[in-house]
Regions:
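Catalytic tyrosine of NAD(P)H-dependent dehydrogenase/reductases that use a Tyr as the general acid/base
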Residues: 13, 21, 91
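A conserved structural motif in NAD(P)-dependent oxidoreductases
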Residues: 66-77, 88
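Short C-terminal tail/terminal secondary-structure segment
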Residues: 5, 82, 93-106
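Alpha-helical segment proximal to the catalytic Tyr-Lys
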Residues: 29-33, 90
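A glycine/serine/threonine-rich, flexible loop-to-helix segment
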Residues: 33, 45-66
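Short, flexible catalytic-loop segment of classical short-chain dehydrogenase/reductase
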Residues: 4, 21, 38-53
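Active-site "substrate specificity/gating" loop of NAD(P)-dependent dehydrogenases
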Residues: 1-10, 32
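Active-site helix of classical SDR
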Residues: 16, 24
Length: 106
C-alpha cells in the first residue's frame, strides 16, 4: 500500500515497495515475448502475529482507515496469488493487485 500512498517516517520502506512495482513492470515488458506474465500483490493490513501485538487504540486507528472496516487474513492474499497464477489471469501482466479492503483508495 505505502508504495502508492507514501508513509511519513518510512521513506526506506516505501521506496523498497515502490521498487517492486517498477521491477514488476520492467520484467513484464521483458518477458512478455515469452508469454510469461509478471504481477505483484500488495497486501494491506493482514491479521498476523504482528497485528495481534497492537493495542485496541492502534487497531481502531487502522480500522478507521480501511473502508471495509476489517483486517484481511492470509487466505485473502493466497486467493489473490492463486488467481494471478491461474489461466484466468493469462492476459494480466505488469500489474499490482491491491488486497487491502479499500485502504489504498483513501
Amino acid at each position: 500500500v505505502v508504495a502508492h500512498t507514501g508513509n511519513p517516517g518510512q521513506v526506506n520502506y516505501t521506496a523498497s515497495k515502490a521498487a517492486i512495482s517498477g521491477m514488476v513492470k520492467s520484467l513484464a515488458l521483458e518477458l512478455s515475448t515469452r508469454n510469461i506474465t509478471v504481477n505483484s500483490v500488495a497486501p494491506g493490513f493482514i491479521q498476523s502475529n504482528m497485528t495481534d501485538k497492537l493495542n485496541d487504540d492502534q487497531k481502531n486507528t487502522i480500522l478507521d482507515r480501511i473502508p471495509m472496516k476489517k483486517l484481511g487474513d492470509s487466505t485473502d492474499i493466497a486467493k489473490a496469488v492463486g488467481f494471478l497464477c491461474s489461466e484466468n489471469a493469462n492476459y494480466i501482466t505488469g500489474q499490482t493487485l491491491h488486497v487491502n479492503g479499500g485502504l489504498a483508495l483513501i
